[in-house]
Amino acid sequence: MRSCLSIVLAAGEGTRMKSSLPKVLHKIAGLPLICHVIKQIELAGVSQLAVVVGFGAKDVVHVVESFVKNAMIFEQKERLGTAHAVLSARLALQKGVDDVLIVFGDTPLIEQDSLLQLRAQLAGGADVVVAGFRAFNPTGYGRLLEKNGKLIAIIEEKDASDEEKKLSFCNGGILALNGKYALSLLEKIGNNNSKREYYLTDIVSIASQEGLDVRVVEVPFDNIIGVNNCFELFEADSLWQKRKARDLMLSGVTILKPETVYFSYDTQIKPGVMIEPNVYFGLGVKVHSGAVIHAFSYLEGAVVGTDARIGPYARLRPGTELAGSVKIGNFCEVKKAKIGKASKINHLSYIGDAEIGAQVNIGAGTITCNYDGFHKHKIMIGDHAFIGSNSALVSPLMIGDGSYIASGSVITEDVPMNSIALGRARQVTKKDYAMKLRARLSANQQKK
């Protein structure tokens, strides 16, 4: 197994984002850009990770160290170009590895297959490998200049001749180096340019002039898309969502209108699930086979059991665990609750901090009153209980198996199993009084 060091460049401020948040910490699918990159790097078998930080270093380091263990952190104190940024990780380079993989922290759509292709070229004898792509409109991209089938230089557009600007094979920004030559090549890069910066792209011409084996690997354009402003963030997120929906549908998930469904990076959906339009999956959602997620539902931090039915217009909040065949209907909210098999909460209810047994029916308009202004309290409802409509269940509370709560009740005391509880005032009916009431109200109206 070849050893590999990956250096992730994450020092840029990203002024075009017009945000105080470092660019690499903006999110797609609920995960920071840099974490998407690191995830693919790990899948590509990288053994060592170095991250070069700069603007917002403290925040970037916190996110990286929370996401991955044993990352080496280096700070680029001056912004003197991409090669200078890579050399900020000199100590990591000096350790010596077979492969050095250099990627940017703002390219969240890179896939492990592309990284593995670059590494395969190194294993096959290459010394420098560049990721390239074919651009329909190459404006703004560096061009890859080849001679006799060999890559000899990367020409930035501002330096390109009219003939070179016609080239459509462009620099994708990802670079792989033979660890034997990586440090020496980087140290030979100069700053003889208008900006007095050290450009990483110069490494290609230096390596070519030294007779080293320089190659290019063509990768899909969407793999190397960088994020520089909020519109590009939206575009990257849209492409990620399309990939996720495609993968799910190919695995056996039915998505009726995929362009209206939003997934998070960790969303898990088993084959046989059906998802209707306009559904949002926040972080930490797992949906088991046979479940149906109806339109306009919002799920986060929830587990949905086999053959469950959610929505339409339902909200599942963190800590929700639904067993098989549970039904959560329209305009219901469930938070931090375990709900047993085949139980139903069909209409207009709030259930929070609860443990509900199997085959329980929760009537329309029922709410758990779980917060006293200082603390949350728990309610437990046993199997086969029936909760009538428009009931208020004041926690802490225990309702036993098979118990029946009359509609409109306010329940403040525990209810033993197989009991009936009524918590409302007795109805008073005055026969024929409606006519007298109307006459009195009418007379009062005429006096005005």
Curated annotation (Swiss-Prot):
Enzyme nomenclature, EC number: 2.7.7.23, 2.3.1.157
Binding site for UDP-N-acetyl-alpha-D-glucosamine: 9-12, 23, 76, 81-82, 142, 156, 171, 228, 317, 335, 350, 361
Biological process (GO), any one: regulation of cell shape
Region named Pyrophosphorylase: 1-230
Subunit: Homotrimer.
Swiss-Prot/TrEMBL cofactor(s): Mg(2+)
Region described as Linker: spans on this chain: 231-251
Reaction catalysed by this enzyme: alpha-D-glucosamine 1-phosphate + acetyl-CoA = N-acetyl-alpha-D-glucosamine 1-phosphate + CoA + H(+); N-acetyl-alpha-D-glucosamine 1-phosphate + UTP + H(+) = UDP-N-acetyl-alpha-D-glucosamine + diphosphate
One Pfam assignment: Hexapep
Species of the source: Bartonella henselae (strain ATCC 49882 / DSM 28221 / CCUG 30454 / Houston 1) (Rochalimaea henselae)
SUPFAM superfamilies in the cross-refs: Nucleotide-diphospho-sugar transferases, Trimeric LpxA-like enzymes
Pathway in which this enzyme or protein is active: Nucleotide-sugar biosynthesis; UDP-N-acetyl-alpha-D-glucosamine biosynthesis; N-acetyl-alpha-D-glucosamine 1-phosphate from alpha-D-glucosamine 6-phosphate (route II): step 2/2; Nucleotide-sugar biosynthesis; UDP-N-acetyl-alpha-D-glucosamine biosynthesis; UDP-N-acetyl-alpha-D-glucosamine from N-acetyl-alpha-D-glucosamine 1-phosphate: step 1/1; Bacterial outer membrane biogenesis; LPS lipid A biosynthesis
Gene Ontology MF terms: glucosamine-1-phosphate N-acetyltransferase activity; magnesium ion binding; UDP-N-acetylglucosamine diphosphorylase activity
InterPro entries documented for this protein: Bifunctional_GlmU, GlmU-like, GlmU_C_LbH, Hexapep, Hexapep_transf_CS, MobA-like_NTP_Trfase, Nucleotide-diphossugar_trans, Trimer_LpxA-like_sf
Name the UniProt record assigns to this protein: Bifunctional protein GlmU
Function text: Catalyzes the last two sequential reactions in the de novo biosynthetic pathway for UDP-N-acetylglucosamine (UDP-GlcNAc). The C-terminal domain catalyzes the transfer of acetyl group from acetyl coenzyme A to glucosamine-1-phosphate (GlcN-1-P) to produce N-acetylglucosamine-1-phosphate (GlcNAc-1-P), which is converted into UDP-GlcNAc by the transfer of uridine 5-monophosphate (from uridine 5-triphosphate), a reaction catalyzed by the N-terminal domain.
Binding sites annotated in the UniProt record for Mg(2+): 106, 228
Cofactor note: Binds 1 Mg(2+) ion per subunit.
Positions in coiled-coil regions: none
Record PANTHER family: BIFUNCTIONAL PROTEIN GLMU, NUCLEOTIDYL TRANSFERASE
Similarity section: In the N-terminal section; belongs to the N-acetylglucosamine-1-phosphate uridyltransferase family. In the C-terminal section; belongs to the transferase hexapeptide repeat family.
Residues the record lists as binding acetyl-CoA: 364, 370-371, 389, 407, 424
